[in-house]
A protein has these predicted regions:
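Right-handed parallel beta-helix
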Residues: 1-2, 15-28, 40-47, 52-54, ...
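Short, T/G/N/S-enriched strand-turn elements that build extracellular solenoid repeat scaffolds
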Residues: 7-13
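Short, conserved, GDST-rich strand-edge loop motifs in beta-rich repeat architectures
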Residues: 35-36
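Glycine- and other small-residue-rich loops at beta-strand/loop junctions that grip anionic moieties
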Residues: 98, 151-152, 173
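Extended hydrophobic-aromatic, low-complexity segments
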Residues: 171-172, 194
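Acidic, glycine- and Ser/Thr-rich low-complexity intrinsically disordered tracts
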Residues: 189-199
Length: 199
């Protein structure tokens, strides 16, 4: 499988995307002299700083998110990893979705050796009508030493047949989230499912 390293994929307001059989890591991204990691992108001809890297970020344009959404995305049989807890301030999520994105499936993926795995909704205000309809199935989380397996704000998620091993937090259900879990296995995971943080 191809390995994408030192690259952060940002899918903004796109539709009908399939990513299969790839490996993604931000491990080893250089740090600037200030000691901070900065990722730079080009938007509308201008250079902008986009912050700490996600392996993949899926989002709608936040200015027009109510009408200009992204969706119909399938990510299948991929591997996501970074540097583990020792580098937790250097990397953000492995697979993050924010703003008004809809109709996504994440299947048969392997997430491992990282601090924060998957974020769905960047904050309590990131809850749109009918947003983030997600099927999340047959994924393997191994040694996620922090959180976000996933952290879900808003949206409707069917979370089934996933396996979590040696993780800190499991599925964190928060504001406006509708969640249905079945057939998942949590091995040596301290908080498999929680909804006590504003869910």
């Amino acid at each position: 499988a191809p390995l994408f390293s030192h690259i952060t994929f940002v899918m903004q307001s796109v539709d009908n995307i399939i990513i299969r059989n790839c490996r993604f890591t931000m491990k080893g991204v250089p740090v600037l002299r200030t000691g901070e990691n900065k990722i730079v992108a080009w938007r509308d001809g201008a250079q902008v700083e986009v912050g700490d890297p996600d392996c993949i970020g899926i989002q709608a344009d936040k200015v027009s998110a109510k009408t200009n959404w992204g969706g119909h995305i399938w990510i299948d049989h991929c591997e996501f990893f970074n540097g583990g807890a020792a580098n937790k301030d250097r990397y953000d999520g492995l697979l993050d979705c924010k703003n008004n994105v809809q109709w996504m499936t994440f299947s048969y993926n392997y997430f491992h050796d990282h601090d924060k795995s998957c974020l769905w909704g960047k904050g309590d205000s990131d809850v749109y009508e009918n947003c983030r309809t997600i099927s999340f199935h047959h994924n393997f989380f191994d040694q996620i030493e922090g959180s976000r397996l996933p952290l879900q704000r808003g949206g409707h998620v069917h979370y089934y047949n996933n396996y979590m091993r040696g993780c800190e937090d499991g599925w964190d259900i928060r504001t406006g989230a509708v969640a249905y879990e079945e057939g998942c296995y949590f091995e040596d995971t301290k908080s498999p499912i929680r909804s006590d943080r504003g869910g």
